[in-house]
């Protein structure tokens, strides 16, 4: 999330105006830090703090779902030192924010492919998901090693396997079938998309859901 975000007191929003699902592309952290002659990792650290504040505010407002684009499947081209810090920051964030999630009745969900993530990060993810599974408030969905095209490909593979095993009939496939096999199955489509760096592109994020 762009570290330039300043959290000001939010005016009360009429219940009928509150979005059900907010999706945020968290970019601009490294550039924010570089403009201030700071290392890129400083920007990522401040971005994590902004994510915490926004998550708490969404929980306060009663927003059902908040999806944060934390790490794109295309981010692996970054320097190894930066990637190592991002993995460390992610694991640290998930542990430190457990109390916050429990206090605010937040349930954690994580989407994306796990194949390139360190085992330590996966373990922390699973522990945090299990710990918050009984919470009934805002669903905080973190997109980690996520790509919208990969999500659709994975959904098609699941559907193809079900057709092959005759669990699913080709003629019965419709849009809802695809939605049910996406990483976000069970979630509503976003009705508000925010890109913190202000760029006007979606960067392979929730392609099916926001179309």
Segments predicted by a language model, with ranges:
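Flexible, compositionally biased loop and terminal segments
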Residues: 1-211
């Amino acid at each position: 999330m762009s570290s330039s975000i300043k959290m000001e007191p939010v005016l009360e929003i009429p219940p009928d105006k509150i979005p059900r699902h907010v999706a945020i592309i968290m970019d601009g952290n490294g550039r924010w830090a570089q403009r201030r002659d700071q290392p890129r990792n400083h920007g990522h650290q401040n971005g994590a703090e902004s994510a915490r504040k926004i998550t708490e505010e969404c929980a306060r407002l009663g927003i059902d779902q908040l999806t944060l684009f934390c790490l794109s499947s295309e981010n692996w081209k970054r320097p190894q030192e930066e990637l190592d810090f991002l993995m460390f920051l992610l694991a640290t964030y998930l542990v430190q924010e457990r109390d916050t999630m429990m206090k605010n009745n937040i349930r954690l969900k994580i989407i994306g492919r796990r194949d390139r993530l360190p085992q330590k990060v996966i373990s922390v993810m699973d522990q945090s998901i299990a710990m918050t599974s009984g919470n009934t408030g805002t669903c905080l969905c973190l997109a980690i090693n996520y790509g919208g095209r990969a999500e659709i490909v994975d959904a098609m593979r699941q559907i193809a396997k079900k057709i092959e095993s005759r669990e699913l009939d080709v003629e019965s496939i419709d849009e809802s079938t695809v939605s049910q096999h996406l990483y976000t199955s069970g979630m509503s489509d976003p009705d508000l998309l925010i890109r913190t760096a202000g760029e006007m592109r979606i960067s392979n994020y929730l392609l099916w859901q926001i179309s």
